[in-house]
Amino acid sequence: IAHKKNMLTTSYVSPEMSKLDEKAKEAGIIIMNEIGVDPGYDHMTAMDIIDRVHEEGGKIDNFHSLCGALCAPEASYNPFRYKFSWSPKGVVMAGNNDAQYLENGKVINLDTTLLFKNPLEINFPGVELMHVYPNRDSLPYIDLYGIKEAKTMYRGTFRYPNWCAALDLLKALKLTSYEEQDLKGRTYAQLTAEINGLDANNLKEDIKTKYTIDENHAGLKAIEWLGVLDPKPIPLEKGSTFDLTSDLMIEKMMMEDDERDMVIMQHIFIITRANGNREKIVSRMIDYGDKHYTSIARTVSLPAAICVKLILDKAITETGVHIPIKKSIYFNVLNELKKHGISMEETTTKL
């Protein structure tokens, strides 16, 4: 702002950033945020549909906006069915959030302990039946997207089946806590047993009894494979179970050089047209990495790079603090992204 230079990030707008809106306008600059894939491409493709529906006199009744950065199906062979294509600790950290969304006119608040219980099941053609857990807070998007008429507003994260069961059990066993522990001279099994009041020598059986699960429970298979039940010495003297769990995941769950990542996105709208007819609009994207770039790198960086060029070319002339929800911003960005093979496929069904 002091140097009157435009700025762009792919990060969420912080409250501190929002407060700079007037100062940025006075300086005649734009501070563009949330212009990656999620957030970013999700905003732009959602607003493209919302604006079209509103322009035609319709209204948005329900909106589910779902996205996942995953490994491609052929690489999803470990018991978590997940490999990291971006910040590993960030992925695990997201699992410690509470969640809030609107469902049939009612605000649903989910404590972090319930985050991975009862995931939505959503079919994604070309992939498989996916599980979805809710993002931190979907409610601000009702105002941001201008859909005050909506009865359901849900933003969520796609995962293959197994992930939610595994994370739910890890959390129940206090294995994603940020609290620092004395780890000197202890094994993974001893620590897991001690913080849960279980017997380290009979740990797996104790867990099955405590949580009423059997040998074939997807979560139990996953955490056993990860190593948190092993009588193996912990290599740290101090640290949190979050650190230990995420370190084990980094060791075992990174993408191999010959494996592809994948980003999938799906918007599901239920709308009412001006004539009273109801329709379901489903908009989908599936994007794979290749030998040159990961999908997550392409889908985060291209919207940002295109937006930078449009600002420099004066095709975007807004000032102040923004996210890409105005047509004057998203329209040209989406058109340019199509030239790079990033686009949504849209289908409409009458209800």
Protein language model regions, located:
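Rossmann-fold NAD(P)-binding glycine/threonine-rich loop
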Residues: 2, 10-33
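Adenosine-phosphate binding glycine-rich loop
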Residues: 23-71, 308
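Conserved donor sugar-nucleotide recognition element shared by glycan-biosynthetic enzymes
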Residues: 16-17, 42, 300, 304
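Extended, hydrophobic alpha-helical segments in both membrane/secreted and soluble proteins
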Residues: 6-7, 333
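C-terminal catalytic/substrate-binding lobe primarily of soluble NAD(P)-dependent oxidoreductases
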Residues: 55-351
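Glycine-rich, histidine-containing beta strand-loop boundary motifs that form or position
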Residues: 11-12, 35, 67, 348
